[in-house]
Amino acid sequence: MARFKFASFLLAVATLLLVVSAEAQLGGLLGNLLGTVTGVVATTVSSLVKIVDNLLFDSHRIIIVMDKGTKPVLDAVANSSTAVWTEAERIQNIKNIVDALKLHAQESQGPLVQLLSAAGIQFKSHWITNTVEVLDCPLELIEKILALLSVKEIIYDLIITLDPPEPTADSTSNTVTAGWGATKIKATNVWASGNTGQGVVVGTIDTGVRGTHETLASNWIGPYGWYDPAQKTATPYDPNGHGTHTMATIVGGKGTGVAPGAKWMACKACETTCTLTMINTCAQFMLCPTDTNGNNCNPAKAPHIVSNSWGTGQGMTYFQPMLDAWNAARIIPVFSAGNSGSKGCSSVVSPGDSAKAFSVGATDTSDALGSFSSIGPAVNGLIKPDFIAPGVSIRSAWNGNNADYVSLSGTSMAAPHLAGTIALALSARPGFCFDTMKEILSGSTDRSLPRAAQTCGTMSDTVFPNNEYGYGRINAQNVVNAALAY
């Protein structure tokens, strides 16, 4: 654990503050990129300057990462069996995980909490990541925090961009005809068998949801199905529209959703952008949902899938504790690959570039990859995206009124198609873990696809998996059949 003399720290700050203005201008130039990070992970003395940069030019909020992390706790308490579980077994496992993570955070954060409380500093603990967020931390307190052996590092609150969609067309039609995406992946064939996702709950972390929309009003789970950390609103709402569109693509009625019989829940982490602290709060909510005031968490209400149409940077290991906790709880994480395809190879963003999350690229009606869709390999060398799915001109619900619709393009629209497909699979055969679900999905794709505009890495786009199409375009009928046969 690095320790610093405060005088040396101030000297370093004074020396390096000369570059702060230039760095801020550079950050502005990068601001339009998907997943742009307005700050850099902070470690050692040079990183403390990044904290000063943030306090001068950003949100004044830092995140203190504890040295012990969460992985040893999860390894010790979570049931790592890959067997198919009953729902009761899944809920008991989640309860064990939540109890252990809470106790671990309480013990490891004790000295830090005492220090912050004595200084009269506002803070909030996140047990899912074993971190503490602090608002307006004075510089003189930073050295004391870093001197604690229980503290690993300080990072500052990141601004995370939503996966920005491309508007295609507006529509107020209330047609019940299935969208082209659901038809393309043969979700409609699954519906014909009577499976529309019954018994499965899907969560999203996004801009909220217009819960009264005609496509979504009937299948919200109700209590413990909504959390707005900033405003503590009592019922779902969405001032942006992005979250309504993505949710309806997963579970919406009137032809919008892949799994219209599934239930939904949501946590509002974003406006036009999201913050890392809000993502942490919502990730924790998904593991143990609370009432609308953030109290009385109930692991029995945890969703089976969390769909995320946002991302930031590349190789961001900070998200790993969140993914580890969800995986241990058999909550399957789905992420959009990103809309930075114009940058070429290795443009897939985090957290979808993790081995423990599904990353989804976007295709059009002819199965061609959208020009905007990010491709691999990931910066950690993994083949990404994992799968591709419809994501061009996807018609879904919008937030203008209860019968408002819009067609959008983006990997934000593709990830919900995979989330809905997984919901259909879990409805047919509940209880799969992430690794088993990946095995089922990867063996069930359609691979007669157009040649990609470019190939990345060492393999051709005709060999699967590859860094353009992953394992191929999802096929819900094949996935459900494979789940039933597993």
Regions found by a protein language model. Give the residues of each.
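Extracellular S/T/G-rich loop segment that most often corresponds to the catalytic His/Ser-adjacent loop
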Residues: D206, V349-S427, G431, R473-V480
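Hydrolase catalytic cores
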Residues: M247, M265-C270, S347, G391-F464
